[in-house]
Amino acid sequence: MHLLPRETDKLILTTLGTLAQRRLARGLILNRAETIALISSQLQEFVRDGRHSVAELMDLGKKMLGRRHVRKGVPESIHTIQVEGTFPDGVFLVTVDDPISSDDGDLNNAFYGSFLPIPSADVFPAAPEPADTLLGALICRKETVKINASRRRFRLEVKNAGDRPVQVGSHYHFLETNPALIFDRLLSYGYHLDIPAGTAVRFEPGEKKTVTMVEFGGKKIFHGGSGLGNGSFDENLRETKVKEMVEKGGFGHKEQEKIEEGPVTEMNREVYASMFGPTTGDKIKLADMDLWIEVEKDYTVYGDECKFGGGKVIRDGGGQASGRHDHEVLDLVITNALIVDWTGIYKADIGVKNGIIVGIGKAGNPDMMDGVTDGMIVGSSTEVISGEKLITTAGALDVHVHYISPQLMTEALASGITTVIGGGTGPADGSNATTCTSSSFYMQNMIKATDTIPLNFGFTGKGSDSGTNAMRDIIEAGACGLKVHEDWGATPEVIDRALSMADEYDVQINLHSDTLNESGYVESTLAAIKGRTIHSYHTEGAGGGHAPDIIVVCEYENVLPSSTNPTRPYAVNTLDEHLDMLMICHGLDKSIPEDIAFADSRIRSETVAAEDVLQDTGAISMISSDCQAMGRIGEVVTRTWRTAAKMKQFRGPLEGDEPTRDNNRVKRYVAKYTINPAITHGMSHLIGQVAVGCLADLVFWTAESFGARPEMILKGGVIAWAAVGDANASIPTVQPVLGRPMWGSQPEAAALNSIVWVSQASLDKDLVKRFNIKKRAEAVKNCRSIGKKDMKWNDTMPKMTVDPETYDVRADGVLCDVPPADKLPLTRRYFVY
């Protein structure tokens, strides 16, 4: 066949488009991906027929599917579908705006060429939805936004005496505009148009307009333009140097006799949000969940927002400072970012330099903008990511990873994970069951194998040894922690020795305790821990641990508890899948009664239900995957938010929250896969939060897809993954738009933008030189001095009891129980399979 990449890419459209037709034919309404694929693949078939023009297909694309054929929120989330195909006269772009614009569409077009039966319209009842239930809905405060509020302004009369139109942007020094514009140039010295940042005023030939001018902010140092008023603003120059330059250059000038003060410009909140994103007091619905966030603070400056694009703000002499050296300015600015972090839910520009977040606040040009944060200058060396229609979170940490297959890492990155901690060597039986990279030989191989993967890695050695020699060896070989696992031995003696090594080397211990109760009950394990800090994996117990009451460790200050995601949240199918998962992962045999009893002892509806409650109250502090060993690496983020959504449904708003303001709950849950695992494993000084000094590992989401599929992942300040279209297309938004590895995922770049986390002892022994690795090696630290009190938004320590016969779980005497969910958000609406 000798197909080109662009042809094999489009086969994905055909595959999913055909699948969507089959689903529609049997009466299923389509989700967003299915809808786009069906319309796109049908357009390609019409292009192939060669009987339609580009213009005709732009119209035909609107006449396939109607609102009744797609899921709630799909019409509003698909603004444009674009394809490129080979017409009789070449390859051209077809753009279909608002493709779902009628109730009924025309299924004859949707099924054209498929030979599938066209379903009756009666199968798809139309049901209009209230606006506030739309995916990613935005509710703005009922007030206006005042721009440039505290500055002087006046009305200026302008005429275009030229024979061509002139368009002037918001932050262009008006004095410097086209010589064909006639107005009082001297009066305009030090002023720009009083219009929203990034907008413009157009003057047609011969047209007269009266516009409002507003004084520049900042230091009032001007650069660029035509050079009429360059330098520091000086009132004395208006009638001298500036006047001389205007006359010498032949710039249109007419003195304005009457000068009127202009009114403060006010913007409708909805209009403001459409341009710059939501601001203080505005509320956003997260995906299809009943979770709402409210913007707590906006650090940008109304009227001086950074905005990139043709004729917009970030241009020389405007929002981009002139004459700055590379070291003086940001490498990257993320403009108008809506940040969702444990520290708050707020709006700000984010500045990145050398892969590190160096500023969060207001970026721009301090020469002519107010409020620019120190160290956040935008210059000609600065790249821009427009964050105004996106939500920004810290990259997720998955700290329970079985390194079974390299393919796990692609799935992890695509889901928003930027750091993985765990152990293993591949699909060996030991690694299938436990997260241990057990020898120096394997440690070197695994660190080398992951040296060019764009994720931060940490490897845990085996801590199941009542002697200390092997543990010393593996820590000094690069282990960032130790794993104690019952499959290798989790006896009191083993736990005590492992914790002694952890204290000596300042690393963390991850514990999978003794389900069998072979050496003692949970009390014996707690006695062996002796009040020392430890990370308790899958604290509910289905993933392993003292049956039936390992969950009681949630009450202890020194125990840092986490969940693994197969039980997140408790749903009607949760228990039924667990037996087979458990048997395979831990090498059990269904023909052996004791193995069946062992497995059954770990699967309890009562403790799984209690886990929901304890996650919601902050008694369980973290969520991780246990990937390919009873968990799913690509669902750490998704299942965390499903849990949050379920618990709001069953328990209502948290204290301090409201029905349409869930900021406290959102901060609690985002902390579970960002800051808290970072603190637990001694990494929070560099990752786990959107904070100055941290690595720029950032994930960007649309509000309507929050928690399901990211738009872009930044790894150490470099784009490593993004949703991008056909590589042969004229623009990057042509279908199929797929999550794809970007430049930051290329091997040499990955080594530059990522970290390998190791022990300080291994660095002292010159691990980087011995292993010849390219990644930045960082030592974990402060793993031993932390406790439950340090878990952000997840530090509660209720008195726990578990009835050994009924398995009822009580926290501070209150029964922890919720029913299993039979329907959850972030499910079929978002995923094809």
UniProtKB/Swiss-Prot annotation:
* Organism for this UniProt entry: Cryptococcus neoformans var. grubii serotype A (strain H99 / ATCC 208821 / CBS 10515 / FGSC 9487)
Report which superkingdom the organism of origin falls in: Eukaryota
Annotated control of activity: The urease accessory proteins URE4, URE6 and URE7 are required for urease activity, URE7 supplying nickel for the functional urease.
Family to which this protein belongs:
In the C-terminal section; belongs to the metallo-dependent hydrolases superfamily. Urease alpha subunit family.
> Which SUPFAM superfamilies does this chain map to?
Composite domain of metallo-dependent hydrolases, Metallo-dependent hydrolases, Urease, beta-subunit, Urease, gamma-subunit
Its recorded name reads: Urease
Q: Which GO terms describe its biological process?
A: urea catabolic process
Q: Which cysteines are joined by disulfide bonds?
A: none
Stored HAMAP family: Urease_alpha
One GO cellular-component annotation of the UniProt record comes to: urease complex
Q: What does this protein do?
A: Plays a nutritional role via nitrogen acquisition in the environment. Contributes to the central nervous system invasion by enhancing yeast sequestration within microcapillary beds (such as within the brain) during hematogenous spread, thereby facilitating blood-to-brain invasion by C.neoformans. Affects fitness within the mammalian phagosome, promoting non-lytic exocytosis while delaying intracellular replication and thus reducing phagolysosomal membrane damage, events that could facilitate cryptococcal dissemination when transported inside macrophages.
Gene label: URE1
Q: Urease domain location, by residue?
A: 395-833
